[in-house]
Regions:
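Non-catalytic protein-protein interaction segments used by genome-maintenance enzymes to assemble
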Residues: 1-46, 51-54
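Metal-dependent nuclease catalytic regions and adjoining charged, substrate-binding loops involved
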Residues: 4, 38-41, 51-136
């Protein structure tokens, strides 16, 4: 099918190079608890950072992804989590993004009312209206 390009703008918190020449892309986080496996290894944000790094001159380099987390627990602490992404994981995310974009472009709207962000979301009224109208 037709290949379309889209620009994505964002800010990476920190990019470093280690002694071996690997690129380390770090995302700073604040959380109320330690991160679990899924939060580290399935996070789409750092997958996008890796894709951006590869598209901007780092495709021939080893890329490590890191979360630097300040945990706001009863006794605050700092934890680091390292992860990597495979080509399959990159392509999986690209496919998901394309599929969602195609849906949005076609007028498909499916609210995610299970998110913790829902109560303060700017689109809350649109979601509520969608449910009131029967989801059509």
């Amino acid at each position: 099918g037709e290949v379309r390009r889209a620009e994505l703008a964002g800010h990476v918190d920190l990019v470093e190079e280690d002694d071996s020449g690997a690129v380390i892309i770090t995302d700073w986080k604040t959380a109320g608890r330690a991160y679990g496996y899924d939060e580290v290894n399935r996070n789409p944000q750092v997958t996008l950072y890796q894709l951006a790094a590869k598209a901007n001159g780092f495709s021939d380099r080893e890329i490590l992804l890191r979360f630097d987390c300040l945990l706001k627990t009863q006794k605050p602490r700092f934890e680091q989590y390292y992860t990597i992404r495979t080509e399959v994981e990159e392509r999986r995310l690209i496919r998901k993004i394309r599929t969602v974009w195609e849906g949005i472009s076609s007028g498909v709207f499916i609210p995610n009312d299970t998110s913790w962000r829902c109560p303060n979301c700017h689109y809350r009224q649109a979601c509520d209206q969608w449910f009131l109208e029967g989801g059509d």
